[in-house]
A protein has these predicted regions:
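Short linker/helix segments within small regulatory modules
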Residues: 41-56
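Short Cys/His-centered divalent metal-binding micro-motifs
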Residues: 33, 56-79
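A boundary/linker detector
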Residues: 1-12, 29-34, 73-113
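A general structural-boundary detector
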Residues: 4, 12-15, 43-47
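Short cysteine-rich loop/turn motifs with clustered Cys
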Residues: 9-36, 60-62
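Glycine-rich loops and low-complexity Gly/Arg-rich segments
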Residues: 52, 60-63, 83-86
Length: 113
């Protein structure tokens, strides 16, 4: 059990974040399933913001883990989250463009003159 699991205020905050974000990951858009409330400004570094509903975003487990893989744990900031969100959105647009281009390529285009 981590130090937050027995913190009733944290549990209420986390549930409210999930509700306010409609149980939807704010990075990839997946809805439902196991979700995690992420502090924009870190839980330990910004204790005055721990339970502020403006200091949280709902993330799926995969996106939450990827954020912390990129930025580590502790001392995280809203700036890091915004940067991560922008990178994720850029990658999503690139993937959509590639998928669209692949879908619109003529079949056997390598055999055309």
């Amino acid at each position: 059990m981590n130090y937050r699991e027995d913190d009733d205020k944290f549990k209420v905050w986390a549930r409210q974040i999930k509700i306010q974000d409609n149980w939807t990951c704010q990075i990839c858009g997946v809805k439902g399933g196991y979700m995690e409330a992420h502090h924009l400004n870190g839980y330990n570094s910004f204790p005055e913001q721990r339970y502020n509903l403006d200091n949280g975003k709902n993330l799926c487990q995969r996106c939450h883990q990827r954020f912390h893989d990129a930025y580590g744990y502790g001392g995280n900031t809203a700036f890091q989250y915004k940067e991560y969100e922008e990178i994720a959105n850029t990658l999503k647009k690139i993937a959509e463009k590639i998928a669209l281009e692949n879908k619109t390529l003529p079949e056997n285009s390598e055999n055309r003159n």
